[in-house]
Design a protein with these regions (language model features):
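Membrane-interface interhelical linkers
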Residues: 1-20, 52-76, 114-123, 140-146, ...
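Glycine-/small-residue-enriched transmembrane alpha-helix faces in small-molecule transporters
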Residues: 1-42, 76-79, 83-87, 130, ...
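C-terminal-most transmembrane helix of multi-pass membrane proteins
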Residues: 2-4, 46-48, 206, 242-291
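Transmembrane alpha-helices of multi-pass small-molecule transport proteins
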Residues: 13-14, 35-83, 110-111, 157-164, ...
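Hydrophobic alpha-helical transmembrane segments of multi-pass membrane transport proteins
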Residues: 18-26, 30, 58, 75-90, ...
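Hydrophobic/aromatic residues within transmembrane alpha-helices
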Residues: 34, 43, 47, 91, ...
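Specific alpha-helical transmembrane segments that line the substrate/conduction pathway
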Residues: 42-53, 81, 88-119, 154, ...
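Hydrophobic transmembrane alpha-helices of multi-pass small-molecule transport proteins
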Residues: 106, 120-139, 156, 183, ...
Length: 291
């Protein structure tokens, strides 16, 4: 028996978020492998510039006919995107990928608590928070404090990204807003990347890996998330982001040989349960009769 149409509609945007998470975290693992060649900021520049070029070619966004409010929204979205990437890549250059994402996801979780209007959503956020703390294995005090600070700051920018991604999706057709925001984020990162990596950015093999990172970590996931945010409330989307540490841990294990401990495995179970609970709550809220 096929699932009801309402269930399919509620699962659709959730599947987009999960697919985007898989793409971005495996792309991040590839980026870590690229950092010895181009540096953290150089990788960010390659990722954003190449992703912006791809999106401009594919989407051909319209530059005229937008209001000042439209431009303010898309520029803020681009600044949040660029800042989030620069801060996060500085973090993973200093601390393990799983720990960096664990700290970063606290930003979306805080947004979930603030944006939630239902008490049960606070429960899912608390459960996910317990999971991401457990995923750290109680070893955050042994992390490079600068790297941990970068990851936490990236989490704040991630929360801003969620808010302005949703607003951009409502103001711009298709992926036009994403393409424009990516272009602004690329311009923001360009002087930092050139200062750190210089001519190393233009080595053909580095450009090839940079394109892979751009497609996996920017073009595909941001497009999927932008589509999902048109149909998901910000609070539900933010709790779904708690899947990111679990995905990052898997990517770190498969590509970077970072093994999981039993406590980290339990943490993954907690964040998955929290995410599933958030999905069920969102679907139940849509089915509830008004009045």
């Amino acid at each position: 028996m096929s699932p009801p149409a309402g269930a399919r509609r509620s699962l659709g945007p959730v599947a987009l978020v999960v697919a985007g998470g898989l793409s971005v975290q495996f792309g991040a693992a590839v980026a870590v492998l690229l950092m010895p060649r181009a540096g953290a900021l150089g990788v960010v520049t390659l990722r954003l510039v190449l992703a912006a070029l791809v999106l401009f070619v594919v989407c051909r966004p319209r530059l005229r006919g937008h209001s000042r409010a439209d431009w303010a929204t898309v520029i803020t979205f681009g600044a949040a995107m660029g800042g989030m990437n620069m801060l996060f890549y500085q973090a993973v250059d200093r601390i393990p990928l799983g720990a960096a994402v664990t700290l970063e996801v606290l930003g979306p979780l805080a947004l979930s608590v603030i944006a939630s209007r239902r008490l049960v959503n606070l429960l899912w956020a608390a459960l996910a928070l317990a999971g991401v703390v457990l995923l750290g294995g109680g070893g955050f005090d042994r992390l490079d404090p600068v790297g941990a600070a970068f990851a936490l700051a990236a989490g704040g920018m991630w929360a801003a990204y969620i808010i302005f991604s949703a607003r951009t999706g409502r103001r711009f057709p298709q992926a036009d807003g994403l393409a424009l925001a990516m272009g602004f984020g690329a311009l923001l990162s360009l002087p930092f990347g050139l200062a750190e990596a210089g001519s190393r950015l233009f080595v053909p093999s580095t450009l090839g890996l940079g394109l892979a990172v751009a497609l996996m970590s920017s073009v595909l996931p941001y497009t999927l998330e932008l589509l999902a945010l048109r149909r998901l409330p910000a609070a539900t989307f933010a709790v779904l982001m708690s899947l990111e540490p679990a995905i990052a841990a898997a990517a770190g294990f498969l590509l970077l040989s970072q093994a999981l401990s039993p406590s980290e495995g339990l943490a993954i179970v907690l964040v998955v349960v929290a995410s599933m609970g958030a999905v069920r709550t969102q679907a139940a809220g849509k089915r509830a009769p008004a009045g």
